[in-house]
A protein has these predicted regions:
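A conserved catalytic-core segment of Leloir-type glycosyltransferases
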Residues: 35-100
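Nucleotide-sugar-dependent
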Residues: 235, 288-315
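Membrane-proximal helix-turn-helix segments that form the acceptor-binding/catalytic region
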Residues: 20, 115, 122-126, 130, ...
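Carbohydrate-associated surface elements
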Residues: 37, 178, 196-199
Length: 315
């Protein structure tokens, strides 16, 4: 099968879509990826890239077609909006000309933003082939949960866009069974909605702890609680900081380690300083996903948090 994948994010950005394409290749499919210039979550183009190129690459046997976009920058609302709109516009205008090979299926890996599906709908109409949409994030609920948009007018426009995208999808896949009702309510044909959960990459398996002096990780001494992932609005980082402050005097052996990047990393750094938590709360840079099993093994506990929100509870 000839598959045209549309995703604003792709390798070398570390998302599950990379493994999806690799799996398709293993099964003998021919894949073309329509994506943007990698800039997540650093906010600027990765080394070797500019906002305008390179325009074509290869990933395994797959052809990668990149379109220019406005980098995310520091994640401010206007900059993020420009990032979202620029990809949707550039991919809609340049995608049809740059993705000319045979296509049997258009597949959208729909994280945030939902606007990345707009080019796919245009290509579906031009190429007259079916389109599958794999919903990873519900919009506009995600915008509300992340406190990114408060305007009822803007949220209403997003709602109308989402309805149009769902109605024009020949197959809607959802990563959570609790997503089924919201997507059907917004216009997806219930007979064409399927549950497709996410998976853990193959390298997430138990690994032996390194011997003293051999350990490739850098963790403080004590009972280490590791939070590894996006440091964003919905992760409720303030809850972890408050917990660290509460146990600081009674359990000084507990060490909290944050590893990752995101919109609230700067806030986290400032809060650690403001509350004098530097002895027990530590920041580490993000690491490649394939390196994380060793860090997980070295920690005493792994922590995952989401803000108490009805929308986030659907995931």
């Amino acid at each position: 099968m000839n598959i045209l994948l549309v995703s604003q994010y792709f390798w070398p950005e570390g998302f599950r879509v990379n493994d999806l394409v690799a799996g398709w290749e293993e099964r003998g499919h021919n894949v073309t990826v329509l994506t943007g210039i990698p800039n997540y979550a650093a906010g600027r183009p990765y080394p070797g890239y500019t906002a305008f190129g390179p325009s074509t690459e290869t990933f395994g046997r797959s052809r990668v077609v990149r379109v220019p976009l406005v980098p995310r920058g520091r994640g401010g609302r206007l900059r993020m909006a420009a990032n979202y709109v620029s990809f949707a516009l550039a991919a809609s205008l340049l995608g049809p000309g740059r993705c000319r090979g045979p296509v049997d299926l258009i597949f959208v890996f729909q994280m945030s933003p939902v606007t990345m599906a707009i080019p796919a709908v245009i290509l579906r109409r031009l190429r007259r082939v079916p389109m599958a949409l794999w919903v990873q994030d519900l919009w506009p609920e995600t915008l509300v949960a992340a406190k990114a948009v408060r305007s009822p007018l803007l949220l209403g426009l997003v709602e109308r866009l989402v309805r149009a995208l769902y109605r024009r999808s020949d197959l809607v896949l959802v990563q959570s069974e609790k997503f089924v009702e919201p997507v059907v309510r917004r216009g997806a044909d219930a007979a064409r909605v399927r549950y497709l959960p996410n998976w853990a990459e193959s390298f997430y398996r138990p690994v032996p702890l390194a011997k003293d002096g051999d350990d490739p990780v850098s963790l403080p001494r004590g009972f280490v609680i590791l939070f590894a992932g996006n440091l964003g609005e919905v992760q409720s980082l303030e809850t972890i900081v408050e917990a660290a402050a509460l146990v600081r005097s009674e359990a000084p052996q507990i060490q909290w380690v944050f590893m990752g990047v995101g919109r609230r990393r700067a806030w986290l750094e400032e809060e650690i300083l403001r509350r004098g938590l530097g002895a027990s709360v530590h920041l580490r840079d993000a690491r490649p996903a394939e390196a994380m099993p060793v860090w997980a093994a070295a920690a005493d506990a792994l922590l995952v948090t989401l803000r108490a929100d009805p929308v986030l509870a659907l995931t």
